[in-house]
C-alpha cells in the first residue's frame, strides 16, 4: 500500500500543475498529507499580484499553476473599493507562515488607486520575500517599486530570472548563481563601457548558456549592445530565446539612432541554436531598407526556430498605411525565407502599432485588401503552426472604413448581435471625442469606436508587458470599459447616457463573432492550429474536428 500511496501522490503532484487556486484549496481539505505535501506548496509556489481578478473558465487551464492575488470582482467598482480588497489580500499574504514556499512572484504595475499607500505595502512584501532569499523569479513591473527595492533585489542569490535596470545592476553579478534568464533595460544615455566590463561579459556568456536574453533599450537601439559585445569578443553560443528592440528613426540626430545591421549581431549570437525570437523594430527613414536587409541577412541562420514574434514600433509614421504595408512585406518575406518554416514554426505573434483612435493615412479599402492578400499567401505555408497571437488585429482591420462598418452594420446577423448592435450604433450617434490635430470635438465614427474597443480588450493582457510569445501563459484579466475616457469622450447634453462597464461584456461577444470568418479561414488553411488570441479574444481549436470555440466570450 505504501507504494500505491506514493504513486497516487506522484500523480496528484503532476496533476496539481493544472489546478487553479480554488481547486488547490479544495485539494488541501482532503487530507493532512495532501495539504502539506502538495496543495500548500503548489498554492504558494507561483503568485501573481494583479489589479483585477482573472477570467475563469472550465474550458482552459490558463489560470492553473498560479495563485492570483487580485482586487474586487465586480463589473461596477471604484478604484478605492478595489484598493480595499487588494490591500487586504496582500496583508493576509504577509501574515502567512508559508512565504518561504514562494518561488515565483510577479507584481504588476499601477495596482493601486491610492498609489502611495499601495507602494508602501508592496515594498513591505518585497522586503519580506527578499530577506528569505529563496525566491527564483521576482518580476516587479512597476519601475518606482523596483527602484525602492533594487538594493535588496540585486543581492538575491537564488534568482533564475533576473532584471537589470541602468548602470549599477551588474555590480553584484559575482554573487549571482545559476540564472538562465536576463532582462536588461537600458537608459537612452547609458555608456556601455561603464557597465559591461570584461568579467561581467564572461559571466553573462557562462550563465546564459541555454537561456534567454531580453534587451529593452529606451533609445530603441538594442543592436548597439551587440556591437559593443562584439568589440569585447563576447559570444553567446547557445542562447535559446532572444528579444530585442531597434528602430531606425526618421530625422533623429541622436547618436544612439542607427541603421539595423546584422554584422555584429550574427557574430555575437549563434542564431542556429535560437528556439524563440521576438523583434520589436521598424525603419522609418525614407528610401532606406535596413530592416529588410537585416532580416534577410539573419534568416538563413535560424534553423532551429519554433517561436517567432514581431512587434511594429513607430514614432513619426504611426498610422501611415504605406509604412504598415512595407513592414508587413518585410515580415512576411522573412517568414517565407526561414529554413524549414513549414515543418518547424509552431508559434507566430504579430503586433502592429495602430493609432489610439484608429484614424490613419491612406487607409482606403483597396490598401487593406493588398495586405490581406499578402498574409493569405504566407499563412497557408505554415502548416505546423499551432498558435497565433495577434494583439492588435482588430485595430489593424478596422482602421479601414469598410471593415469597421462591417463590424457594426454588415457583420454577424445572429440573435445576440441583432439585439445589441443597434445599441452600440446609438452610442456612436450620441458621443464625440476630442481630436487633438483638429483642436475640436468630432463625432465618434465606426473606425474610432472599433479602435477604442480594441484598446479596451488589450487591457486583458497588456499588464503582462513581457514577451508577446508568452501571452498565452497568463490568464487574461477581467477588465471592462465604461465607454468614456480615452480622448475625452463625452455625450451630447440632450442625451441621457446609459453606457457604462456593464455594456462591455456584450461588446466583447460581438467582437468574438466578428472574428468568426477569420477563424473559419485559419482552421481551413492551418491543419495543426490549436489556439489563437486575436485582440484579447481567446479561441481554442480542435485540429481533429476542424472546429473552434471562444473561451471567455
UniProtKB/Swiss-Prot annotation:
Interacts with SKP1 and YPT32; SKP1 is required for the interaction with YPT32. One of its GO terms (biological process) is endocytosis. GO terms for molecular function: GTPase inhibitor activity. One of its GO terms (cellular component) is endoplasmic reticulum. Residues 3-49 form the F-box domain. This is Non-SCF-type F-box protein ROY1. Keywords: Cytoplasm, Cytoplasmic vesicle, Membrane, Nucleus. Non-SCF-type F-box protein involved in the endocytic with the vacuolar sorting pathway. Acts as a repressor of YPT52 by inhibiting the formation of active, GTP-bound, YPT52. Involved in the defense mechanism against methylmercury toxicity. Induction: Expression is RSF1 and RSF2 dependent. Coiled coil: none annotated. It is a peripheral membrane protein. It is found in: Cytoplasm; Nucleus; Cytoplasmic vesicle membrane. It comes from Saccharomyces cerevisiae (strain ATCC 204508 / S288c) (Baker's yeast). Present with 3080 molecules/cell in log phase SD medium. The F-box domain is required for interaction with SKP1 and defense against methylmercury toxicity.
Amino acid at each position: 500500500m505504501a507504494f500505491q500511496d506514493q504513486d497516487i501522490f506522484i500523480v496528484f503532484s503532476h496533476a496539481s500543475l493544472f489546478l487553479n487556486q480554488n481547486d488547490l484549496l479544495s485539494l488541501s481539505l482532503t487530507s493532512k498529507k495532501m495539504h502539506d505535501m502538495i496543495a500548500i506548496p503548489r498554492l504558494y509556489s507561483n503568485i501573481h499580484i494583479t489589479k483585477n481578478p482573472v477570467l475563469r473558465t472550465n474550458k482552459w487551464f490558463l489560470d492553473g499553476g498560479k495563485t492570483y492575488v487580485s482586487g474586487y470582482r465586480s463589473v461596477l467598482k471604484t478604484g478605492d473599493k478595489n484598493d480595499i480588497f487588494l490591500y487586504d489580500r496582500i496583508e493576509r499574504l504577509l501574515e502567512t507562515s508559508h512565504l518561504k514556499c514562494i518561488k515565483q512572484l510577479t507584481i504588476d504595475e499601477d495596482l493601486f488607486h491610492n498609489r502611495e499607500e499601495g507602494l508602501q505595502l508592496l515594498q513591505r512584501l518585497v522586503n519580506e520575500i527578499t530577506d528569505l532569499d529563496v525566491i527564483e523569479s521576482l518580476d516587479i513591473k512597476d519601475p518606482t517599486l523596483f527602484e525602492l527595492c533594487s538594493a535588496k533585489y540585486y543581492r538575491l542569490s537564488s534568482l533564475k530570472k533576473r532584471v537589470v535596470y541602468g548602470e549599477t545592476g551588474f555590480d553584484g553579478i559575482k554573487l549571482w548563481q545559476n540564472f538562465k534568464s536576463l532582462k536588461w533595460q537600458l537608459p537612452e544615455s547609458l555608456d556601455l563601457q561603464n557597465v559591461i566590463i570584461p568579467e561581467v561579459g564572461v559571466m553573462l556568456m557562462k550563465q546564459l548558456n541555454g537561456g534567454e536574453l531580453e534587451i529593452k533599450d529606451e533609445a530603441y537601439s538594442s543592436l548597439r549592445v551587440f556591437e559593443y559585445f562584439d568589440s569585447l569578443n563576447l559570444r553567446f553560443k547557445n542562447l535559446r530565446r532572444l528579444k530585442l528592440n531597434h528602430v531606425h528613426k526618421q530625422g533623429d540626430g541622436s547618436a544612439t539612432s542607427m541603421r539595423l545591421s546584422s554584422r555584429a549581431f550574427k557574430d555575437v549570437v549563434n542564431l542556429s541554436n535560437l528556439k524563440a525570437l521576438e523583434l520589436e523594430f521598424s525603419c522609418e527613414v525614407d528610401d532606406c531598407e535596413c530592416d529588410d536587409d537585416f532580416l534577410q541577412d539573419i534568416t538563413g541562420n535560424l534553423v532551429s526556430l519554433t517561436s517567432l514574434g514581431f512587434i511594429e514600433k513607430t514614432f513619426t509614421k504611426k498610422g501611415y498605411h504605406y509604412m504598415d504595408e512595407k513592414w508587413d512585406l518585410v515580415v512576411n518575406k522573412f517568414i517565407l525565407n526561414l529554413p524549414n518554416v513549414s515543418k518547424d514554426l509552431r508559434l507566430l505573434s504579430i503586433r502592429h502599432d495602430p493609432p489610439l483612435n484608429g484614424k490613419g493615412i491612406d487607409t482606403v479599402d483597396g490598401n487593406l485588401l493588398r495586405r490581406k492578400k499578402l498574409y493569405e499567401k504566407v499563412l497557408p505555408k505554415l502548416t505546423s503552426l499551432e498558435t497565433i497571437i495577434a494583439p492588435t488585429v482588430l485595430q489593424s482591420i478596422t482602421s479601414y472604413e469598410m471593415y469597421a462598418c462591417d463590424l457594426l452594420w454588415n457583420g454577424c446577423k445572429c440573435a445576440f448581435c441583432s439585439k445589441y448592435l443597434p445599441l452600440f450604433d446609438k452610442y456612436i450617434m450620441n458621443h464625440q471625442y476630442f481630436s487633438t490635430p483638429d483642436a475640436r470635438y468630432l463625432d465618434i465614427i465606426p473606425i474610432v469606436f472599433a479602435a477604442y474597443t480594441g484598446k479596451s480588450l488589450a487591457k486583458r493582457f497588456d499588464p503582462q508587458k513581457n514577451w508577446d510569445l508568452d501571452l498565452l501563459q497568463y490568464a487574461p484579466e477581467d477588465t471592462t470599459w465604461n465607454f468614456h475616457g480615452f480622448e475625452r469622450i463625452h455625450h451630447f447634453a440632450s442625451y441621457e447616457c446609459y453606457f457604462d462597464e456593464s455594456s462591455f461584456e456584450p461588446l466583447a461577444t460581438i467582437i468574438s463573432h466578428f472574428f468568426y470568418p477569420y477563424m473559419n479561414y485559419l482552421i481551413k488553411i492551418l491543419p495543426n492550429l490549436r489556439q489563437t488570441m486575436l485582440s484579447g479574444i481567446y479561441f481554442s481549436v480542435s485540429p481533429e474536428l476542424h472546429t473552434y470555440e471562444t473561451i471567455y466570450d
